Swiss-Prot record:
Catalytic activity, reaction form: tRNA(Lys) + L-lysine + ATP = L-lysyl-tRNA(Lys) + AMP + diphosphate
Main subcellular localisation: cytoplasm
Classification via CDD domains: LysRS_core (cd00775), LysRS_N (cd04322)
GO terms for cellular component: cytosol
Regions that span the bilayer: none
Positions with a binding annotation for Mg(2+) 2: E405
Location relative to the cell: Cytoplasm
Entry's Gene Ontology BP terms: lysyl-tRNA aminoacylation
Subunit structure, as described in the record: Homodimer.
Protein name (database record): Lysine--tRNA ligase
Enzyme Commission number(s) of this protein: 6.1.1.6
Binding of Mg(2+) 1, residues: E398, E405
Cofactor binding comment, as recorded: Binds 3 Mg(2+) ions per subunit.
Length: 488
């Protein structure tokens, strides 16, 4: 297919021919750098020009051209930027020719001595310049940059070149995930990998992506959670496990939801809901201390991290908002209450579904500071242990910050008879139109029948956590390559 090139693209391609005519390459073999911008600045920024010139320190520095101002070039590497001074009179012939054919965006290797400018900035005085990679497309100009959010996400490679905030966000993302691993490794958890393709839908209430497994001649689901295989490992005697990995949910996209996202789930034998609240809070405390974060702006709110996090009962919070003690209502009365509050009743709804709708309508928007909400209804918690004080509810909690859910945890249901009944109830919901209801995972039931110790488990959405700690407004700004609509 013929491509229409811009004038700049034509000019740059013509320069390749000019380079070749002078026995120079537009795409050179690699040359190893001997220092990066961070190392040079940390080690030499406090030395005077006289001291540097006296030492005659020679380095090879590689980077992308971000600025050309007469004999001065600014090269950018993965740590920052470095000025280069290229005096054509002192360059050899090939370097001088290379210099004359350079463009904004080209990648160079420069050998030279370290000095300082009149403004006391470090500079490498070039002795030899080699073009490593010719940039055939012009970068956005530095003044206007790449500002359109959609374009930045679509061409993340250009965004990373042009925007320091983007680079810092994704470096921070890596550091946050390392920090999460540090926390769990220090508590003697072991990291595991479980299957992404699953024959059974389970572990969360979500719509799946479905694929066909040719070798087995049947449909499989991309996992919507890692819960069930991780709990099988608890049965097997691995008392503390965690997994960081991709989850796939075939649902909507907004500023805090992406169908492909990263999460951590962790499970601990001989723990419970309250232990999981402490562990989940511990993750946040570890990261906040590690990165010295005092407060953040998230979802339009100023968030301060005060430990321990606030804890509220779901039923108490709803009752306070609507001025009705819903604990005293039976299912029929709950349906009447739902109609009064304009809640659409689905065919599969029962007592607990209405509680959840009331919570989402009246309470979620009030949860600004970090808050654990506990005591979820059994109908929406098919994998959580029952509350022995009121069997309509479970030992489950969610962590909310800035009105958004960040974590989900419970005392795990380890009664195989009760678990099978819950799965069967989920099938009835599916028959009545609940597309997010779970299927029966017979192998999981089989595992529970061997005996799972009392266990606590929790899951945290890592992308949303990174949004919070890096103060980004959209999940698509903390995912390197988010899925976007096709260009028309």
């Amino acid at each position: 297919m013929e491509r229409k090139l811009s004038e700049q693209e034509e000019i740059r391609r013509n320069k390749i021919a000019e380079l070749e005519k002078n026995n120079l390459q537009a795409f050179h073999k690699t040359i190893k750098p001997t220092a990066n911008s961070k190392e040079l600045n940390e080690k030499y920024k406090n030395l005077s020009r006289e001291d540097l010139d006296k030492q005659n320190l020679e380095f090879v520095f590689n980077g992308r051209i971000m600025t050309i101002r007469g004999p001065f070039i600014v090269l950018q590497d993965n740590c920052g930027q470095m000025q280069i001074y290229a005096n054509k009179k002192t360059l050899n012939e090939s370097s001088a020719k290379t210099f004359s054919l350079m463009d904004f965006g080209d990648i160079l290797s420069v050998r030279g001595t370290l000095s300082k400018t009149n403004t006391d900035a470090l500079v490498i005085k070039a002795q030899d310049i080699v073009l490593l990679t010719k940039s055939l497309k012009p970068l956005p100009d530095k003044f206007h940059g790449l500002v359109d959010p959609e374009e930045r996400r679509r061409q993340r490679y250009v965004d990373l070149i042009m925007n320091e905030k983007t680079r810092n966000t994704f470096v921070m993302r890596t550091q946050i995930i390392k920090g999460i691993r540090e926390y769990f490794d220090s508590l003697n958890y072991i990291e595991v990998d479980t299957p992404i393709l699953n024959p059974i839908l389970g572990g969360a209430a979500a719509k799946p992506f479905i694929t066909f497994y040719n070798a087995l001649n049947r449909n499989f689901y991309l996992r919507i959670a890692t819960e069930l295989p991780l709990k099988k490992l608890i049965v097997g005697g691995l008392d503390r496990v965690y997994e960081i990995g991709r989850i796939f949910r075939n649902e909507g996209v907004d500023t805090t939801h992406n169908p492909e996202f990263t999460s951590i789930e962790f499970y601990e034998a001989y723990s419970d809901l309250w232990g999981m609240m402490e562990r989940t809070e511990g993750v946040f405390k570890h990261l906040i201390n590690k990165f010295n974060i005092k407060e953040v702006k998230f979802n339009g709110f100023d968030i301060t991290f005060n430990f321990p996090f606030k804890r509220v009962n779901m039923i108490d919070a709803i009752s306070e908002k609507i001025n009705v003690d819903i604990r005293k209502l039976n299912e029929e009365q709950m349906f009447e209450l739902a109609k009064k509050h304009g809640i659409k009743i689905e065919k599969f709804f029962r007592y607990g579904h209405i509680i959840n709708e009331l919570f989402e309508k009246y309470v979620e928007e009030t949860l600004i500071e970090p808050t654990f909400v506990y005591g979820h209804p059994i109908e929406i918690s098919p994998l959580a242990a029952i509350d022995p004080d009121d069997k309509r509810f479970t030992l489950r909690a969610e962590l909310f910050i800035g009105t958004k859910e960040f974590a989900n945890m419970f005392t795990e249901l380890n009664d195989p008879i009760d678990q099978l009944q819950r799965f069967e109830n989920q099938l009835l919901e599916k028959e009545n139109g609940n597309e997010e209801a779970n299927e029966i995972d017979w192998d999981f039931v089989n595992a529970l029948e061997y005996g799972m110790p009392p266990t606590g488990g929790s899951g945290i959405g890592i992308d949303r956590l990174i949004m919070l700690l890096t103060q980004n407004d959209s999940i698509r700004d903390v995912v390197l390559f988010p899925q976007l609509k096709d260009l028309k």
